[in-house]
Amino acid sequence: YVVVSTDYRTQLKDIDKSEYSDLQGFSSALQQAITCAVEDFGDATNYIIEHSVEWQINPAQIIACGSSAGAITALQAEYEICNQTAFADRLPANFNYAGVISFSGAICANGIPKWIMSPCPLMLFHGDADSTVPFTKAVVEEEMGLWGSNFICMQLKEKETAYYFYIAEGIGHSLSYSPMKDN
């Protein structure tokens, strides 16, 4: 096995909070932060693919994994690939992850998320008492919002797509870091 840990720009930490003191400003800052993280993640994925022969990596076996903001990044990248957005152009044609593992993640979308293509198999873990990343959804402005693991899995079930969903009852955002810390 080969494990690669990627880094990405964390825009919200670097922005003056006064820039997103209202809902519209926050919505814009959130979308920009997620876009930057996903772009960096895509570039890192592409770098891995470009060096796959040298590093003896099978690009068809790359699994994306993240927790909290990293889970949002991994899920959003898969969502962008499935919807053939400009993000997908950063990657080789027909590339998709072999799977995505998400600890307390969500997808950012304008309106209810729509999947043009079915996603790769997803494994999601989320506490139903999470007040940081929504378990189901958090509409930020009009229809733009974060659509959490519970909502995503309802869609995957309807699409009859491969997924596993572990609901940690009564657990908050600690599920985003406890598997890495406690195991």
Task: List the predicted regions and their residue ranges.
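Serine-hydrolase catalytic machinery in alpha/beta-hydrolase-like enzymes
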Residues: 1-57
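Gram-negative outer-membrane beta-barrel domains
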Residues: 5, 55, 67-69, 150-155
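Structural recognition of the beta-strand scaffold that forms the well-ordered cores
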Residues: 2-7, 61-65, 98-103, 121-126, ...
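The feature captures the conserved acid-bearing segment of alpha/beta-hydrolase catalytic domains
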Residues: 88-160
